[in-house]
């Protein structure tokens, strides 16, 4: 089944939140490490905005995971 934009944003946001929490990071810490505003990260985690690949890259580096680890959630049923 093909996902729409909203579903993709929501799934990616949930995955980022799960990874952040598993690393014991606050939203403020991750936002700072990734070089973005706290409010932007919040909106990404909530699936409220589509973010750029660059921001996913920055977030993945800050979480010490690969970009595919974040996007693999899109292949889950």
PLM feature spans:
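Short basic helix-loop element that most often maps to the first helix and adjoining turn
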Residues: 14-33, 58
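Short, charged recognition helix plus adjacent turn
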Residues: 1-2, 69-77
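A detector for short, charged/polar N-terminal pre-domain segments
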Residues: 1-11
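DNA major-groove recognition helix of helix-turn-helix
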Residues: 45, 55, 71-74
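Conserved hydrophobic/aromatic packing and binding residues within compact polymer-binding modules
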Residues: 16, 30-31, 41-44, 70
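Recognition helix of helix-turn-helix/homeodomain-like DNA-binding domains
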Residues: 35-49
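DNA major-groove recognition helix of helix-turn-helix/homeodomain DNA-binding modules
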Residues: 52-69
